[in-house]
């Protein structure tokens, strides 16, 4: 059975980069009729917070990305300890005591000599007495996994054939000096024991994948199918990492972005398929193909979410927005007419309030100097309210006959005088809802 996972750290809220990983893994599992696991990577007790765990769940539920089961790494520490013991017994796990300063000096020396900055395995040469002395002086050391100096190869679902020389990679630290289990080990143990068959994550994990493949093999596990998607950049190709804090899903939600818009964009962004609004999750699942994604950095522009949101809202029936209309103050007996008139002119649900305020209270007129005399003459011909569906046509016909204006020169100044805007709903539909004309004052 196909099994995928999304493994966020509860050290913050889900941002757009996290979503891309979560969505790809979700769609793969659902398309194959498999299992999607939400795995909370909470092995760092100082940074992990329960409020972020709750936030992760809320964001995924808002998007409709429902998991089949949830796991927490903090409840599996004994499993990681057992794996570490196994690696020690195999001679593949060793303690190292260098300080960050010492490691930095080693790296600089290697670079100056034209060599790759790879850990020199000096700790393997320490005697038991030397280790005891270092522990007494510095405390417990870190634990490194001893890589086999060979090429590590796999067929990547996005990047194609990958080959990495392990001799160019430092033996990874799997356990910190304070005993904290790091992601590299915990992830391997979990993926193996949970039967994860497919792992999709960012291309910044490629080297990490190489080391994890060796750890999986050492522990007797089955290597899953890996795929590494490109990293997101800003619309001009700039690094997105510094902006991710402003691209949290809950912030986009607060700004009015709809789940369908977010999912439609992120399911296709970076692939050879065009971005199309999909309102049915089943269609997203059926149309997803990991092989259609490319390796080039993918430009993300949050502004692209709003046209999709607008198209989604325009297609909603009254029943789906009745609560939002009521909250904005639209009377129930006017809701159907209001929604029919405004639905094509709303980008987010936040636009409902301003449109209703305009219709209820009127708008400050926008009148160009060259149109003042014309507008005054036209307003003198505007009948008293209440208006109906024929008012606009009858009024503009009378104004045309009186002034000789026609086309845009006739309609635009009148629209701006009544609504304060140069664009908006069809005026024939809007007039019956317009209760105040401030331009008359």
From Swiss-Prot:
SUPFAM superfamilies in the cross-refs: An anticodon-binding domain of class I aminoacyl-tRNA synthetases, Nucleotidylyl transferase
Entry's localization field: Cytoplasm
EC numbers on record: 6.1.1.17
GO term, biological process aspect, one: glutamyl-tRNA aminoacylation
Claim: Transmembrane is one of the keywords in the record: no
Protein's UniProt keywords contain Protein biosynthesis: yes
Catalytic activity as recorded in UniProt: tRNA(Glu) + L-glutamate + ATP = L-glutamyl-tRNA(Glu) + AMP + diphosphate
Motif ('KMSKS' region): 239-243
Keywords: Aminoacyl-tRNA synthetase, ATP-binding, Cytoplasm, Ligase, Nucleotide-binding, Protein biosynthesis
Motif ('HIGH' region): 8-18
Top class in the EC scheme: ligase
Gene3D superfamilies registered for this protein in UniProt: 1.10.10.350, HUPs (3.40.50.620)
GO function terms (MF aspect): ATP binding; glutamate-tRNA ligase activity; tRNA binding
InterPro entries: aa-tRNA-synth_I_cd-bd (IPR045462), aa-tRNA-synth_I_codon-bd_sub2 (IPR020751), aa-tRNA-synth_I_CS (IPR001412), aa_tRNA-synth_I_cd-bd_sf (IPR008925), Glu-tRNA-ligase_bac/mito (IPR004527), Glu/Gln-tRNA-synth (IPR000924), Glu/Gln-tRNA-synth_Ib_cat-dom (IPR020058), GluQ/Sye (IPR049940)
UniProt cross-references to NCBIfam families, sorted A to Z: gltX_bact
Primary role: Catalyzes the attachment of glutamate to tRNA(Glu) in a two-step reaction: glutamate is first activated by ATP to form Glu-AMP and then transferred to the acceptor end of tRNA(Glu).
Family of the protein in this entry: Belongs to the class-I aminoacyl-tRNA synthetase family. Glutamate--tRNA ligase type 1 subfamily.
PANTHER family hit by this protein: GLUTAMATE--TRNA LIGASE, GLUTAMATE--TRNA LIGASE, MITOCHONDRIAL-RELATED
Protein name, per record: Glutamate--tRNA ligase 1
Protein's organism: Roseobacter denitrificans (strain ATCC 33942 / OCh 114)
